Every structure is written in structure tokens, then in C-alpha cells.
């Protein structure tokens, strides 16, 4: 039976967690002082302008003064930390019986715990984390009842958080629409139907130089909002082929654009290639809310953005077919969309 990384007490790293040399993080990664930090309370025109530029240049940015209740952010982080501090037998309830949980389609909406990185069965090494994942929209009672009963406030707090984070995410998507010249609400349909919350726990690691909390990747969905309170997140600056550290800001959200949004914008906007490194002394919890299409969707560049000078860079494809490739083919960051790329 798999052991929770969060319950390990060890002075060495098991061989199964040792990353190949070419996939390991560099020793000294500089803080990315150029990562955009956008104040959502500033003048609307400037706000849209800054978000548009951040989407074009980085595919990742942080937002402050966003109106999300700060107390709710703190409460949610606290109950998530409390969950991972529970005894192993309590967390066992969220592991499928018989075999380790793996990310596969359709993603299970009910709460499931992924341990020892085993969702990456096609990788040659495991990631130093445990992940609690569950759906958050719509919030019907059956779904909420699948969430952890302990900590006692988990369901109440996370339900409130899920509603508020969706409001903020849809607001971000409308700012993106404005920057692209798309009608407001363009994404307020099946393109944003699925909402998953992935809470990642990265325990202290005896040898951070040989392990990863998460390898370099695009998110496959539309957009992700990430709450973090400690360093660990790093982004690849593609044009320079260098990694930078994304410094946490208390009560800020990191906004990651996914591969699906990159395709819909016909590459007007970038996606974010990012990874997570481990720490020798501190444990880290991050809360990621991923919003993306229903699996029945067809994905293609928005027709409103296409013309003779800007032809489509991708042919239409099934989101479920893409997701199968995305989850199974790790040969390149954008392997999931390569079969649909049009050479123009």
C-alpha cells in the first residue's frame, strides 16, 4: 500500500523520487522581479491593459486588491493544512481501494487523494507531494458530502471559497475578453463548466536538489488561480530558456493561463510553463482552482480573432481527446496540442 508523503519521517529520499539530471531544478534560480503584479482596484482601462500585456508576455501574473475576502483565504489555507496533518487512517478514506489514485478522464468530481506522485505513472520518477482533488461546481449536496468531514469546518469553508474563487476567475476571464476584443461572457458556458480544487502538500524534503514537487508543465485547462504562502513555484521564461522563482505575496492570487486558453486565443496569449521545487526545512501547501471545459467540448481558435492576416494555428479538436494525450504524453510541454497544430 502506498505511503503518504505527508506522513513520512525520513532522512533520505527513496530512489523512486530521484529525478533524472536533465529534469532537476537548477541550484540558484533568481526571483522573477518582472512577474507582473496587478492591482485590481486601479483604473479599469489601465487594469485591462496590464492584464493583456501580462497574458501576452508571461502567461502568468499575480493579482492584489482583488476583493476576495482575506479572512476566507486564511481560513481555507488553515483547514487544508489541518487535513494533511490528520492521521493516515483518516486520509486513507479518500484513496481508492486496491490501487493508487491516478489522474485519468473523466476527472473524478468526488474527493480523491493522490499520493506519492502516482498519478504520473508514465513518468520515470515520483513527485514529492500529496494532492487532495475534488470538484467544486456546481455545489450540489452529493458532491459536498464527498469532501472530507475532518477538519470539522472543511466543507463549510471550502464551499464558500469555491463560490468566491469562481466569481474572481470569471471576472479575470472577462478582463481577458476585453483585452482580446471578445464579447464579455465569451467563456461563461461549457468552456468553464469544470471547476476542480487541487490542494497540494509538499513536505520538507531531505534532498531538494534531486527531487521535484511538480515537473515543468502547462496546465491543460483554461485558467488556474493559485493561492500560495511560501516559495516553491517557478516559471519558465521561454524566450530566454531560463527559470525564475515566483515570489509569494500574502493574500495575492497567482493567475496561470492554460494550454486551452492559448489555443482559443490563437496564441495571442501565452500559457504558463511552471514547476514546483521542494524545501529542506519547511512544508508548503498550495491551493489551485482549475477552471476548464466540459469534456464534450470542441476546442478551436475563437473565430472572432481570425482573419486573412491571422489564420488559425490549430484545427478544431475534442477536449477529451486532447486531455488523454495531455495526461499520457510528457515528451514535450505542449505535446497535448501538437497533433492539432497547423503549419502556416
Swiss-Prot record:
This is Hyoscyamine 6-dioxygenase. Residues 193-293 form the Fe2OG dioxygenase domain. PANTHER family: OXOGLUTARATE/IRON-DEPENDENT DIOXYGENASE (PTHR47991). Monomer. 2-oxoglutarate binds at residue 284. Belongs to the iron/ascorbate-dependent oxidoreductase family. The gene is H6H. The keyword Secreted does not apply. Pathway: Alkaloid biosynthesis; scopolamine biosynthesis. SUPFAM superfamilies: Clavaminate synthase-like. It comes from Hyoscyamus niger (Black henbane).
Amino acid at each position: 500500500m502506498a505511503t503518504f508523503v505527508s506522513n513520512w519521517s525520513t532522512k533520505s529520499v527513496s530512489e523512486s523520487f530521484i529525478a533524472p539530471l536533465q529534469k532537476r531544478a537548477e541550484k540558484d534560480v533568481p526571483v522573477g522581479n518582472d512577474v507582473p503584479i496587478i492591482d485590481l482596484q486601479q483604473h479599469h482601462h489601465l487594469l485591462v491593459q496590464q492584464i493583456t500585456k501580462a497574458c501576452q508576455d508571461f502567461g502568468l501574473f499575480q493579482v492584489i486588491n482583488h476583493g476576495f475576502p482575506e479572512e476566507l483565504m486564511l481560513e481555507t489555507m488553515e483547514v487544508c493544512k489541518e487535513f494533511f496533518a490528520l492521521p493516515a487512517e483518516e486520509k486513507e478514506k479518500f484513496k481508492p481501494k486496491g490501487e493508487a489514485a491516478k489522474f485519468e478522464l473523466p476527472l473524478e468530481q468526488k474527493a480523491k487523494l493522490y499520493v506519492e506522485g502516482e498519478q504520473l505513472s508514465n513518468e520515470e520518477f515520483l513527485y514529492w507531494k500529496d494532492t487532495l482533488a475534488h470538484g467544486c461546481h456546481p455545489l450540489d449536496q452529493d458532491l459536498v458530502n464527498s469532501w472530507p468531514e475532518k477538519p470539522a469546518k472543511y466543507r463549510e469553508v471550502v464551499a464558500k471559497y469555491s463560490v468566491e474563487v469562481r466569481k474572481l476567475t470569471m471576472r479575470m476571464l472577462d478582463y481577458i475578453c476585453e483585452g482580446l476584443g471578445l464579447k464579455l461572457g465569451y467563456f461563461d458556458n461549457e468552456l468553464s463548466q469544470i471547476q476542480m480544487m487541487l490542494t497540494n502538500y509538499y513536505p520538507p524534503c531531505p534532498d531538494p536538489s534531486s527531487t521535484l514537487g511538480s515537473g515543468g508543465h502547462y496546465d491543460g485547462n483554461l485558467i488556474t488561480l493559485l493561492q500560495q504562502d511560501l516559495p516553491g513555484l517557478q516559471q519558465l521564461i521561454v524566450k530566454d530558456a531560463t527559470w525564475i522563482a515566483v515570489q509569494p505575496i500574502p493574500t495575492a492570487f497567482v493567475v496561470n493561463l492554460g494550454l486551452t486558453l492559448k489555443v482559443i486565443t490563437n496564441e495571442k496569449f501565452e500559457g504558463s510553463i511552471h514547476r514546483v521545487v521542494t524545501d529542506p526545512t519547511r512544508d508548503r501547501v498550495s491551493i489551485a482552482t482549475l477552471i476548464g471545459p466540459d469534456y464534450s467540448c470542441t476546442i478551436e481558435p475563437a473565430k472572432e480573432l481570425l482573419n486573412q492576416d491571422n489564420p488559425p494555428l490549430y484545427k478544431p479538436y475534442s477536449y477529451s481527446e486532447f486531455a488523454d494525450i495531455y495526461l499520457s504524453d510528457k515528451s514535450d510541454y505542449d505535446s497535448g496540442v501538437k497533433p492539432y497544430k497547423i503549419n502556416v
